[in-house]
């Protein structure tokens, strides 16, 4: 029987008791993480100041986005190909199929529409990437009838809200529901269920910079009180969710390795969009050998850590955080082959892109796995180069990857493939897609 992989934290009272494993590094010369946030509550909401918004309006805005994002802008079961009215998780890719930006897309609330016949959308993205995404959108705009604008600070606010005591679920309503959000169409609030992990909560966009309860006082919709961005980040990492281009590396990360297929961020049934070819080919014919997973950073005994079954966040931990993209290796390995890359962390937890058959017990093929429960892994790094803006000192910590139960089930059950057609039908569909892509590429070369 597999151990539970539910997310776990250590409260302030429990942290005074004996720890299962050491998380304290005694060397003061090592670079330590910033003050770690408190453990996230079971219910609460956070102001996401690290996220920015772009508005896109105009008669061509829907078809324009349809050719750029991994999500489908049209309701696929509607004979008239009606426009989607729900917010959703999605991504922008480059022509090689690498992620440019992870994003959320929301239809602008009806109360804010200048014309009911003119579609309008809000794109939520990493705040540091707003300028880059605007440049990408303008490059593809050409003669499309639409307007792009980066929203000013305080114009609208992005929130994350959750209630962990409720029954975990992937979504509270169908992505193709006629309802755009859980809020009244007459309000100026946009939102959607966050489908990146079961029961992860909701995404909400409110006008202005006031507290969320100013706009949504109903306790049945919003529970708990406001917490820090750091507490939200801890909760997100415990669920194994990467966000923003400090973790989903721009023009390097692949959408399937970032679990976007599992997070309902990709519609494999839609037509052509930038970066589709590699994504479709990998989905239908390839094996995803690396995925982003939650990891535990530690310096103590592996046996005690193994019994936890899931990452345990300790707000009192004092560990040096490895730099982003630092390589992970087996301890005492004869050949120093990288087993993955560390992406980011808070305190004694983090996220890493892991080779599944090396760092976990997940078996992807019938071949013999390289994983051993006794094997430990480490991430080590050198000091930052002289003249660098960062002041990173050399360091090393052990790292343990965990596979959330929903991630394991998705992988072992064949993911979305299992939910659509049989293997033979999938192979036929894959060939059709590839033939279509090759034909379109041939036509483009003749033009």
Curated annotation (Swiss-Prot):
A single GO BP: iron-sulfur cluster assembly
Membrane-spanning segments: none
Cited Pfam families: Beta-barrel_CAF17_C
UniProt KW Transport keyword: no
Primary location recorded for the protein, binned into one broad class: mitochondrion
Keywords: Mitochondrion, Transit peptide
Subcellular location: Mitochondrion matrix
SUPFAM superfamilies given in the database record: Folate-binding domain
Feature: compositional bias, Polar residues: 24-36
This protein's name: Iron-sulfur cluster assembly factor IBA57 homolog, mitochondrial
Gene: caf17
